[in-house]
Curated annotation (Swiss-Prot):
CDD domains: EF1_alpha, EF1_alpha_II, EF1_alpha_III. This is Elongation factor 1-alpha. The keyword Nucleotide-binding applies. GTP hydrolase that promotes the GTP-dependent binding of aminoacyl-tRNA to the A-site of ribosomes during protein biosynthesis. GO terms for cellular component: cytoplasm. It catalyses: GTP + H2O = GDP + phosphate + H(+). The gene is tuf. One of its GO terms (molecular function) is GTPase activity. It comes from Methanosarcina acetivorans (strain ATCC 35395 / DSM 2834 / JCM 12185 / C2A).
């Protein structure tokens, strides 16, 4: 049923407890993505408990339970259809360390819904998520101003939050005029599939409509092949099977490929998606593939697969443009935090701070600053402590973005401007 519809990866972002999971649950429930036998089971329980929102409650319980067990939900549970697209929710993070997922998850997102609770307005993570989504190249946003029921559907409160969020968006180059701000109550179901009588003052699109009005992402199939490895399995009778998402390019059965930085390579014997063999894989496909002559020790998470004649770049050092989101003191040359780029996590040293920039305009404020701090943007030279694949963002945007983590938080986000190869 989904093959004929274009596919979109959707990130649902925002501050903890602002209603991200409830919104995902509501979207799935309204889109009919809850299996019938589950609905039946809950109908029985709901009858006994006198609750009517049984199926919705089921979605919420399963999301909550999966979150508490610390596992991500099976992909089948996290997909839903709108008239035009079918969506996969790539991440619905709830924890401080969600950023890790956001870097690996949001870099795969074509669009994001930012959930901001009306009673609270903009909070610390709201800011962090907006910055990160921009850095990670998400340029389509929908803003859900949620929990409107908690502010009695007040238009004044809605306008106040719109104002706050617009200010942030402008600061990093989004145009708020092109972004829908939708007053919602995910829990009550207001303005999700149809306009709510409780917000007669709101005339814009509802969430489902806004999702359908997103632009279809361009498939970067003409770029060189790049598949960051998420994991590698050993399957009896087949051998080593790396799995990952095709970011750019096309891989066909019989192609000669290489895994960098290790350098092992061979011929593609088979490609599988959703447990079915396919002749070729395109950007956005989550696949497993088997390469002749590749053993268990030749490939690991963080490696990148490409064609032998155009292999992924391995950086001896690289120049990055970064925005410092938060840091308790100041950052100087010599700082060695962990860089998260595609599926790799590698400690890298900032060997020089080259320029300090105005984060709004990108103009140079200072050459060779002695330090940079939260709120600063900068151009820096970076040396990975071990071999690492990264590409200039102008050449392969999907492999040019990174986040810098330290002390359990995202210190900075950035993009690679140029690579000095090993």
């Amino acid at each position: 049923m989904a093959a004929d519809k274009p596919h979109m990866n959707l990130a649902v972002i925002g501050h903890i407890d602002h209603g991200k999971s409830t919104l995902v649950g509501r979207l799935m429930y309204e889109a009919g993505a809850v299996p019938a036998h589950i609905i039946e089971k809950y109908k029985e329980e709901a009858k006994q408990k006198g609750k009517e929102s049984f199926a919705f409650a089921w979605v919420m319980d399963s999301l909550k339970e999966e979150r508490e067990r610390g596992i991500t939900i099976d992909i089948a549970h996290k997909r839903f259809d709108t008239p035009k697209y079918y969506f996969t929710v790539v991440d619905c993070p709830g924890h401080r360390d969600f950023v890790k997922n956001m870097i690996t998850g949001a870099s795969q997102a074509d669009a994001a819904i930012l959930v901001v609770a009306a009673p609270d307005g903009v909070m610390a993570q709201t800011k962090e998520h907006i910055f990160l989504s921009r850095t990670l190249g998400i340029n389509q946003l929908i803003i859900a101003i949620n929990k409107m029921d908690a502010v009695e559907y007040s238009e004044a409160k809605y306008k106040e939050v719109v104002e706050q969020v617009s200010g942030l968006l402008k600061m990093i180059g989004f145009k708020p005029a092109n972004i829908p701000f939708i007053p919602t109550s995910a829990f009550m179901g207001d303005n999700i599939t149809k306009l709510s009588e409780k917000t007669p003052w709101y005339k814009g699109p509802v969430i489902m409509q806004a999702l359908d009005e997103l632009k279809e992402p361009e498939k970067p199939s003409t770029l060189p092949l790049r598949i960051p490895v998420e994991d590698a399995y050993t399957i009896s009778g087949i051998g080593t099977v790396p799995v990952g998402r095709v970011e750019t390019g096309v891989m066909k059965k019989g192609d000669k490929v290489i895994f960098m930085p290790g350098g092992a390579g061979g011929e593609v014997k088979s490609i599988e998606m959703h447990h079915e063999e396919i002749p070729q894989a395109y950007p956005g496909d989550n696949i497993g593939w088997n390469v002749r002559g590749i053993g268990k020790n030749d490939v690991r998470r963080g490696d990148v697969c490409g064609h032998t004649d155009n292999p992924p770049k391995v950086a001896d050092e690289f120049v990055g443009q970064i925005v410092v989101l938060q840091h308790p003191s100041a950052i100087t040359a010599g700082y060695t935090p962990v860089f998260h780029a595609h599926t790799s996590q590698i400690a890298c040293q900032l060997i020089s701070l080259d320029k300090k920039l105005d984060p709004k305009t990108g103009q140079v404020k200072e050459e060779h600053p002695t330090f940079i701090k939260a709120g600063d943007a900068a151009i820096v030279t970076i040396k990975p402590t071990k071999p690492m694949v990264i590409e200039p963002v102008k050449e392969i945007p999907q492999l040019g973005r990174f986040a810098i983590r330290d002390m359990g938080m995202t210190i900075a986000a950035g993009m690679c401007m140029s690579v000095k190869q090993k």
